[in-house]
């Protein structure tokens, strides 16, 4: 994920990892942001 204005939080809709905020990645199966395992 990225640290930028407008990034999606946990369970926010996404198509790619960079749609999501830091420490979140896009879950392609469900189409939302989830924790990517980083701190």
Swiss-Prot record:
Q: What is its main location?
A: secreted
- What tissues harbor this protein? Expressed by the venom gland.
Keywords assigned:
Amidation, Disulfide bond, Ion channel impairing toxin, Knottin, Neurotoxin, Secreted, Toxin, Voltage-gated sodium channel impairing toxin
Q: Which residues carry this modification: Phenylalanine amide?
A: 39
Do you know which InterPro entries this protein is assigned to?
Answer: Huwentoxin-1
The keyword GTP-binding is annotated on this UniProt entry: no
GO cellular component terms listed in the entry, alphabetical order: extracellular region
Please state where this protein is localized.
Secreted
**Key word Secreted present:** yes
Q: Which cysteines are joined by disulfide bonds?
A: 7-21, 14-26, 20-33
Superkingdom as given in the UniProt entry: Eukaryota
Annotated TM spans? none
Leader peptide range in chain numbering: none
According to its UniProt record, which protein family does this protein belong to?
A: Belongs to the neurotoxin 10 (Hwtx-1) family. 47 subfamily.
**Cited function:** Insecticidal toxin that acts, at least partially, by inhibiting insect voltage-gated sodium (NaV) channels of several insect species. The toxin binds to the voltage sensor in NaV channel domain II and inhibits channel opening by shifting the threshold for channel activation to more positive voltages. The toxin binding is sensitive to residues in the S1-S2 loop of the domain II voltage sensor. In vivo, the recombinant toxin causes paralysis and/or death to two dipteran species (Lucilia cuprina and Drosophila melanogaster).
Free-text comment on this protein's domains from its UniProt entry: The presence of a 'disulfide through disulfide knot' structurally defines this protein as a knottin.
| Descriptive protein name | Mu-theraphotoxin-Ae1a
Instruction: Identify the species of origin.
Output: Augacephalus ezendami (Mozambique baboon spider)
